[in-house]
Amino acid sequence: MINVTLPDGSKRELPDGASPLDLAADISKSLAKAAIIATVDGQDWDLKRPLDGDAQVAIITRKDDKALEVIRHDTAHILAQAVQDLFPGTQVTIGPAIEDGFYYDFARSEPFTPEDFEAIEKRMGEIVDADLPFEREVWDRNDAIAKFEEMGEAYKAELIRDLPEDETITIYRQGEWFDLCLGPHLPSTGKIGKAFKLMKVAGAYWRGDHRNAMLQRIYGTAWADDKQLKAHLHRIEEAEKRDHRKLGKQMELFHFQEEAQGQVFWHPNGWRLYRTVTSYMRRRLEAAGYVEIRTPQLMDRKFWEASGHWDKYRENMFISSIDQEEKVLAVKPMNCPCHVQVFNQGQKSYRDLPLRMAEFGSCHRYEPSGSLHGLMRVRGFVQDDAHIFCTSDQITAEVSDFCELLKSVYADFGFEEPRIKFSDRPEQRVGSDEVWDQAEASLKAAAEASGLDYEYNPGDGAFYGPKLDFVVKDAIGREWQTGTIQCDFNLPERLDASFIGDDSEKHRPVMLHRAILGSLERFLGVLIESYAGKLPFWLAPRQVVIATITSDADGYAEEVKAAMVKAGLHAETDLRNEKINYKVREHSVGKVPVIAVVGRKEAEDGTLALRFLGEGGKTQEILSLADAIARLSEDAKAPDLKRV
C-alpha cells in the first residue's frame, strides 16, 4: 500500500501502482473530474502517472494558479502538431509556456503569414476536439536520438545529446504526434479548451545565439476560459493605445535611432518631464538625509575585478581598450563600487553612520538588440541610485525609513501600495554562505520589523546580496518592478570599506543598495503608459498652450504667456492662421492638459477660455488672467511642495 499525505495534513491509503487520479477519485467524483495535474513531493506530476511510493500529494484543478502554465504548455504542443500537420518538413525545436502565453520555435524556409495563422488555429481546434490522450513514455537515449534523426528533427536530436548521460528521456505523445518533453500535461487535448489565440511571429536564433540558425517563433496566448482570453485581448488593445513609443512621438518627448541602439534622444518636452521628476526626487532625498555625489563613467578593469563585477557581470559590460596605455576600461553597469570609493576617502567613525549617498548615476549595460523596447529596455540609463552605509544595528531602521519614503513617492506619482518580493541567494554569487546567511537574516528581520507583507522569490537575489523588490501596478493592471533595496555584506569586504567603532577598532559597514524609481527611463515609460500620456498637471511638459482665434489676439496671447512663465508655468502660444478647433484637436492629441483660447473678446476683457484635456474640449471655463494663473500655479506644484 501507498501512504499519501494531503495538503491539509490528512492521510489516505492507496494500492501500489495508484496514480494521483485514483487519489482524486477516492476523495470525490467532482475532484477527479476537475483535476488536471498533481504535485508529488513538490514535483509536477501527470494525473495518470503511477506514484513511486509514499508521498505528499496535491491535486491541481483548473482554478489553481499553476493550471495556466500547464494549459499554455499543452497549447504549445498542439501548435507544434498543427504546424507539422499543415506544413510537412517543418522542424520543431522548443516551445515553453511564458508569461500570459506560450511560443514555439520552428525551422522552416518559408515565412509564416497571417493567413497561415487562421489555418493553424483551425487545425489546433480540431486537435482539441479530437480529445487525444497525452501519454508519457520513457525512451532509451540512443533510440530517441536515432528516431528524431530519422524524422529529420536535427534540433531535437541535438537537445537529447546535450542532456546529461543519466537524464531520463521522456516523450509525450498525443495521437500519432510526439515531442521530447519533461511534462507534465493534462489528461488529454480536449481538457485544454479553445481559449487560445496566436498573436505574432518573430525571428529567434536557435538557443538565443546569433551564431546559430534563425528560426521562426510563433507566439500565442492561452487561458482557462473565453472570459479570461477576452479580458487579456482587451488589455493588449489598451496597452497598444498607451504605447509610450507612440505617445512619445505625439507628445514630442524622445526618439531612438539605429546609430545609438538602446539609447534615448530626449527632446525639449521629454527632457522637461525628465528634469521635473529628478528635481522632485532630489528634494525628497535631501529631506530624507541623503547627500548627492557624482562618480566616473569609465573605470579600469582591475577595479571591476576587485568588486566581483568582472567575473559575474562581464557579459553585460561595455569594454574599451586603450592600446597606447595597454589598459582595459569598462563603462560602469552599476554605481555601487564607485560609491564605496567615495566612502573610503578619509577615516569614518560610527558617529558618521548611517551615511546615505545618492547619485543619479548614468549606467550602461549590454542588452541584445532584439530585446530592446523603447524606454522600457535600453542600454544607457540613469538610476535614482543610493547606498546607505550603516551598522548591523541600523539595518532595520534604515529599511523601514526607506520603505516609508518609497511608498510616499509612489503615491505622489499615482501608484497604489506596491507588491513586495523577497529574493535570496542566486546560483551565481560572491561571498561565503555564512555571509549570505547573515545578510538574508538581517534583511528578513528588517522587513518583518517594518511590518512588510512580502512574498518569497527564491534564487533571484543580486550576485552580492539578498533584496526586496517593489512592484507597482499601472492603470490597466500591468505590474512593473521598479524599486529595490539590497543588503550587502560582500562589497564592503571586497573593497576594504571600514569605520572606527565605539570600541576604537575597525569594522566593516553594511551596505544597503536602494532605488525607488529604478531606471528613470523605464519609470517614465511606465508613467506615460499608465496615464495614457495625460500626465498630472505638475508633470506635464507642456502645461498650457494659449491658442488664438484671430490675429487680433496675438499681442494679448504673448502677454498671457509672459505672465504664466513668470508665475513658473510652462506656457506656449499658438498664433498660426488655423481654425481654433484644429488647434484644440492638435494639442489634445499632444496631451496638453490646458488650452487657453483667446480671441478679441478675451483680449478686451482680460480673460481666458480654458479647455481641459479629458473633457473633449466641449466645455470651457472663463476666468480672469489673474484667477487662471492662481489656479494653475497651485495645480503645477509638485505633491511634496503642496505639503510644505
From Swiss-Prot:
Q: Does the keyword ATP-binding apply?
A: yes
Residues that bind Zn(2+):
336, 387, 513
Q: What is this protein called?
A: Threonine--tRNA ligase
Question: What does the sequence similarity comment in the record state about its family?
Answer: Belongs to the class-II aminoacyl-tRNA synthetase family.
Cofactor binding, note field:
Binds 1 zinc ion per subunit.
Query: Gene for this protein?
Result: thrS
Does the record's keyword annotation contain Mitochondrion?
A: no
Give me any GO biological process, just one.
Answer: threonyl-tRNA aminoacylation
Q: Which GO terms describe its cellular component?
A: cytoplasm
Complexes and interactors? Homodimer.
InterPro entries in the record, alphabetically?
aa-tRNA-synt_IIb (IPR002314), aa-tRNA-synth_II (IPR006195), aa-tRNA-synth_II/BPL/LPL (IPR045864), Anticodon-bd (IPR004154), Anticodon-bd_dom_sf (IPR036621), Beta-grasp_dom_sf (IPR012675), TGS (IPR004095), TGS-like (IPR012676)
Q: Give residue ranges for domain TGS.
A: 1-61
Catalytic activity line of the entry: tRNA(Thr) + L-threonine + ATP = L-threonyl-tRNA(Thr) + AMP + diphosphate + H(+)
Q: Classify the source by domain of life.
A: Bacteria
PROSITE patterns for the chain: AA_TRNA_LIGASE_II, TGS
Q: What class of enzyme is it?
A: ligase
Q: What does this protein do?
A: Catalyzes the attachment of threonine to tRNA(Thr) in a two-step reaction: L-threonine is first activated by ATP to form Thr-AMP and then transferred to the acceptor end of tRNA(Thr). Also edits incorrectly charged L-seryl-tRNA(Thr).
Q: Which UniProt keywords apply?
A: Aminoacyl-tRNA synthetase, ATP-binding, Cytoplasm, Ligase, Metal-binding, Nucleotide-binding, Protein biosynthesis, RNA-binding, tRNA-binding, Zinc
Start and end residues of each stretch annotated as Catalytic: 243-536
Q: Which GO terms describe its molecular function?
A: ATP binding; metal ion binding; threonine-tRNA ligase activity; tRNA binding
Q: What CDD domains does the record point to?
A: TGS_ThrRS, ThrRS_anticodon, ThrRS_core
Cofactor(s) required for function per UniProt: Zn(2+)
Q: Which organism is it from?
A: Maricaulis maris (strain MCS10) (Caulobacter maris)
Cell compartment(s), UniProt:
Cytoplasm
List the Pfam families hit by this protein, alphabetically: HGTP_anticodon, TGS, tRNA-synt_2b, tRNA_SAD
